[in-house]
Amino acid sequence: LWRDPSVDGIKTGHHSGAGYCLMASAKRGDQRLVSVVMGSTSENQRAVDSQALLNWGFRFFETHRLYDANKAISKQKVWKGDADEVQLGVDAPMLVSTPRGKYAQLKPSMDIPKTLVAPIAKGQKIGSVKVTLDGKVIAERPLVALNAVGEGGFFKRLWDELMMWWDS
């Protein structure tokens, strides 16, 4: 592993019951992988197994950035607020690793409450974004408010209350 410049983190161990163990991390481009090997018969074998796992992962998987941190991915109507909408996004970059060639099959979906009522604080969790591949959730993150929406004035709140009642 010391010959692979992409390997940037290693933790080794040995226990009579668990054998030789190794956790290694490696980064190539924007993709980071972690390998965990347990129960190897020797120090050399755990390094060989770990390198094989990392090589396999980098060869057959790719990582994509789906959403950037603090960038709007949805705008939602807000009732009774000093603004009519709130921008929603993720508070950290959302990256997913998929088998090569499967990126186009990712299906993102958002779970957002039907009605949002002010006040809403910046950073407040509003809903979630899920990413599925072949019917399985492979990533999920909270959707947060990227801007605050304060409480509207008396007449705005009254009007929106009537409109919410009318819509229900």
Model-predicted segments: where are they?
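Domain-terminus/edge residues, biased toward the C-terminal soluble/receptor-binding domains
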Residues: 1-168
